[in-house]
């Protein structure tokens, strides 16, 4: 029987909330792209990926406070074991680097093409996460 937490509901509720947050971030990234705000769009595309990663972790009852821990554990537990395609790990790392440059590098110039690519990666990752979450026979970590 699934546990219920007064603040967040069930684990399934938390997973759904995080996926919806990822989808909202992706929608925001697209709006920012269309407005020519490429740095902001890169930020939202990264966070779409990050929230989807956290949804996958929540599915197995896991949570991490720091971004690098969430990503490192995702790569260790889901990418290296080929639950998710190996190329996903590289794309997550690239999205993190671009987000970091977009947020903190004063001289970084984000291009429309690069931003479109990051948004596409975020969309693909959300779709992969949804497939994983909905698989009744998916591998369990716990």
Predicted ranges, named:
Residues 1-130, 134:
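Terminal alpha-helical segments
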Residues 135-138, 142:
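Positively charged, low-complexity/disordered segments
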